[in-house]
From Swiss-Prot:
Protein name: N-acetyl-gamma-glutamyl-phosphate reductase
Metabolic or biological pathway, per its Swiss-Prot or TrEMBL entry: Amino-acid biosynthesis; L-arginine biosynthesis; N(2)-acetyl-L-ornithine from L-glutamate: step 3/4
One example GO MF annotation: NAD binding
Recorded family membership: Belongs to the NAGSA dehydrogenase family. Type 1 subfamily.
Annotated Pfam families: Semialdhyde_dh (PF01118), Semialdhyde_dhC_1 (PF22698)
Matching PANTHER family: N-ACETYL-GAMMA-GLUTAMYL-PHOSPHATE REDUCTASE, CHLOROPLASTIC-RELATED, N-ACETYL-GAMMA-GLUTAMYL-PHOSPHATE REDUCTASE, CHLOROPLASTIC-RELATED-RELATED
Gene: argC
SUPFAM superfamilies named among the record's database cross-references: Glyceraldehyde-3-phosphate dehydrogenase-like, C-terminal domain, NAD(P)-binding Rossmann-fold domains
Any single Gene Ontology cellular-component annotation: cytoplasm
EC number assigned by the record: 1.2.1.38
């Protein structure tokens, strides 16, 4: 069993980590839930759904080295550019670190610095980090102490297109993604304020979203492919629906395409391939670590694949716990087996 710390526990991803860890069979204790702003406040005051699970746990702000010394694994759920200041001390303390920010996701530090506009504070650790998408990097995850949890959009996009790219069926993939507002975090803004977005559907950063180089990096490891990506803010709380348009010299029947996906993801506990012509539904994955994938072959050198994930679970905290399970040799599904909600 493991002792866990969460650095940055007051936001949505921190709350989702707490929710999923509360009944994890291999978690002895969540010892730290940190927040400088809320130090001393009961965790359940911010996450009232967890009142019975954490009646005595309070937000704290200890030294990162101390957290690393006291915990077997630490999740960093802090903003981009903040994690790289903390991770070296957490590792020095002896903990395995699973970072939910973008700070260690890129193989090339220069790419990170270009897209995030800051100089990397711990480039010496970048080569040690493993991109934490278990479906592609399970063996490497088992051997590292620094796991870079993928972004929410890249998770849905990469899982939708990986079989197409690795099999060399397409030359170009165009991703169109719709996300719920929880992906923007707990701090409200004019764009994510409910009256502004409840009856709207808005593309943003249509050609230069920060998740684009992340998708390109991972799919580029599978094959030679050109990647484009446009996200949209949808009037939802949770969920990301991604449609991948694959273009190339490809003619394939829907049944054959589905069989390719079933074989590619055979044995993957959190990938569910829909029936031919069946579209994945967001409500079917809400609150779960599943990624549902639907395949459509339309002819004329084009195939369409859609994926659905919960951006806070498989797109963030659930995947982070999946990575913990893999790293520590637990059952990969431990703490993550609850079905979705309907309706």
């Amino acid at each position: 069993m493991v002792v866990v710390g969460i650095v940055g526990a007051s936001g949505y991803t921190g709350g989702e980590l707490l929710r999923l860890l509360a009944r994890h069979p291999e978690v002895e204790e969540v010892r730290y839930a940190t927040s400088r702003r809320l130090e001393g406040k009961p965790v359940w005051k911010v996450h009232p759904n967890l009142r019975r699970d954490y009646p005595d746990l309070e937000f704290s702000d200890p030294d990162p080295v101390e957290i690393g010394e006291d915990c077997d694994v630490v999740f960093t759920a802090v903003p981009h550019t903040a994690a790289m200041e903390l991770v070296p001390d957490l590792l020095e303390g002896g903990a395995v670190v699973i970072d939910l920010s973008a700070d260690f996701r890129f193989d090339d530090v220069d790419v990170y610095e270009e897209w995030y506009g800051v100089e990397h504070a711990a480039p010496e650790l970048n080569d040690e980090a493993v991109y934490g998408l278990p479906e592609l990097h399970r063996d490497e995850i088992r051997r590292t102490d620094l796991i870079a949890n993928p972004g929410c959009y890249p998770t849905g996009a990469i899982l939708a297109a990986a079989p197409l790219v690795e099999e060399g069926l397409v030359d170009v993939v165009i991703f169109d993604s719709k996300s719920g507002t929880s992906g923007a975090g707990a701090k409200p803004s004019e764009v994510t304020h409910h009256p502004e977005c409840a009856e709207d559907l808005t593309p943003y950063n249509p050609t230069d979203h920060r998740h684009l180089p992340e998708i390109r990096q991972e799919l580029g490891k599978l094959g030679d492919v050109e990647v484009h990506f446009t996200p949209h803010l949808a009037p939802l709380v949770r969920g990301i629906e991604t449609t991948a348009h694959g273009l190339g010299d490809v003619e394939i029947e829907p049944k054959e395409l589905r069989e390719l996906y079933v074989e590619y993801y055979d044995g993957e506990p959190f990938i569910r391939v829909c029936e031919v012509g069946e579209a994945p539904r967001l409500w079917a994955v809400r609150g779960t670590n599943y990624c549902d994938v639907g395949v459509f072959a339309v002819g004329d050198g084009r195939v369409v694949v859609a994926s659905a994930i919960d951006n806070l679970t498989k797109g963030a905290s659930g995947q982070a716990i999946q990575n913990m399970n893999v790293r520590f040799g637990f059952e990969e599904t431990a703490g993550l087996e609850e079905p979705g909600y309907h309706p």
